[in-house]
Each structure stands twice: as structure tokens, then as C-alpha cells.
């Protein structure tokens, strides 16, 4: 699972979901990618499930890059607890995703295999995403 080794503060405010992504909107490493169409949160478990779905489908060929990292803690109070008495304990680590962000990249496989691997990964994600390929001949 992806979690930070150490953080400056144990608990944070909830991240805002407004606006489009300013960076990370183009494919940087691979030939194919998954791009977020809508915003939301991705937990470390969802990122790992998508990665496993992709790598199992491409078997031993290809390389996968994860372009996001769950660096924000999300807290939750226990069930049947009265309000007050402080903020709840950290329950999940999340990545705040804005529309247009490239989440995963893939290289070293042909396009039909990449499309199917990405489709399987997209089913594990809680937001709308689309398949993108690298522009032009700048390989």
C-alpha cells in the first residue's frame, strides 16, 4: 500500500474538489495512459487494485507508471460516537484527483493489449476516466 513514511502534520483539512488539473495532464513516461474525466478522491487501496489489474493482464511485458500518490490523510470518527471531543483518527490515505490528470501510464505493449489492461484498471476506479495515447512521434 502507498502511504507516506512521515508527515509534518498527522491530520489535514479535507481537500477541495474544484477546478481542473494544472499539471500532469499529458503522458510523460509511457505510450498509453488513463486520464481522469471528472474529479474525486482515490484511496491507496483503489490505486493498488488498479495497478494489480493492469499488471496481471499484461503479464511479464510492459512497464506501468503510477503518476499519483495518496499523500493526504482522511479522518473518520467511530460509529455511535457523540460529536465533539476532537477530530477522528486517520482512516484512509487519499490522492485528490482533478479533471484532466493522467493517473497511470503504460509502455512496452501493443495498443489492443494496453486498451484491455487499462479498461480493467478503469473498473477499479470510482470516477470517469478515458484511455489516452502519446501524441505524435516524440517517442
UniProtKB/Swiss-Prot annotation:
UniProt cross-references to Pfam families, sorted A to Z: Ribosomal_L16 (PF00252)
GO cellular component: cytosolic large ribosomal subunit
Ranges for region Disordered: 1-24
PROSITE patterns noted in UniProt: RIBOSOMAL_L16_1, RIBOSOMAL_L16_2
Cross-referenced Gene3D superfamilies: Ribosomal protein L10e/L16 (3.90.1170.10)
UniProt GO molecular function: rRNA binding; structural constituent of ribosome; tRNA binding
Keywords: Ribonucleoprotein, Ribosomal protein, RNA-binding, rRNA-binding, tRNA-binding
Comp. bias (Basic residues): 1-17
Entry's Gene Ontology BP terms: translation
NCBIfam families the UniProt entry points to: rplP_bact
Family: Belongs to the universal ribosomal protein uL16 family.
Self-association and partners: Part of the 50S ribosomal subunit.
Function: Binds 23S rRNA and is also seen to make contacts with the A and possibly P site tRNAs.
Full protein name: Large ribosomal subunit protein uL16
Species this protein is from: Beutenbergia cavernae (strain ATCC BAA-8 / DSM 12333 / CCUG 43141 / JCM 11478 / NBRC 16432 / NCIMB 13614 / HKI 0122)
Gene that encodes the chain: rplP
